[in-house]
């Protein structure tokens, strides 16, 4: 489906690795709804500043308002700074009973699927965890025009695993942090409560 295509495409996006290693990346899935843009901007800027100084992935977590089995959850570990925590664990789409336990514990935040990283760390992680994704990538490339990028994707796309970056990289890394956010968030991903349903519920 389209969400899988987007995930698969993003895994092999050569332009992400063609920029300078000091560059920073904000990965935001297209199925997101953000209701407080100013708060979102502040959180992203704080996250970019964090990964600029740390070779870590930073997930944006949102405090759950209900036990939603269609969402992923991030368990908070040790505090690392102002609203920053080490990630203790990821849980994807738990049963409703477990989702309720997560919400009641106060230790779990919704996983928005949004993460921030510096390009150097992202590339190193792909090389270690999913080397096939970078196969065929010529490190000498520093600029991809549309024609070159399309040719690269045509050659390499079929070999990419059909998996999101969350599953492929973040959940297999031991250096992931989470930023507690409050910017009003929903996703239209399959299996979740729709925006219309949420409005109807008040």
Region roles according to the model:
Residues 1-79, 123-129:
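Conserved beta-loop-beta/alpha segment of the NTase-like Rossmann-fold superfamily
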């Amino acid at each position: 489906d389209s969400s899988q295509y987007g995930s698969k495409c993003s895994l092999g996006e050569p332009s992400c690795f063609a920029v300078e290693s000091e560059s920073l990346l904000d990965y935001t899935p297209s199925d997101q709804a953000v209701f407080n843009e100013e708060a979102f901007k502040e959180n992203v800027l704080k996250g970019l500043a964090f990964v600029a100084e740390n070779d870590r992935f930073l997930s944006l977590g949102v405090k759950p308002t209900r036990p939603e089995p269609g969402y992923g959850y991030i368990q908070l570990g040790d505090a690392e700074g102002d609203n920053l925590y080490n990630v203790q664990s990821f849980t994807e789409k738990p049963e409703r009973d477990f989702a309720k336990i997560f919400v009641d514990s106060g230790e779990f935040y919704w996983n928005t699927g949004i993460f921030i990283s510096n390009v150097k760390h992202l590339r190193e992680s792909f090389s270690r965890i999913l080397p096939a994704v970078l196969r065929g990538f010529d490190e000498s490339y520093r600029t991809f025009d549309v024609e070159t990028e399309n040719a690269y994707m045509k050659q390499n796309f079929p070999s990419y695993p059909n998996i999101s970056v969350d599953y492929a990289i973040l959940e297999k890394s031991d250096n992931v942090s989470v930023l507690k956010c409050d910017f009003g968030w929903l996703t239209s991903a399959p299996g979740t409560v729709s925006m219309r349903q949420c409005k109807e519920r008040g």
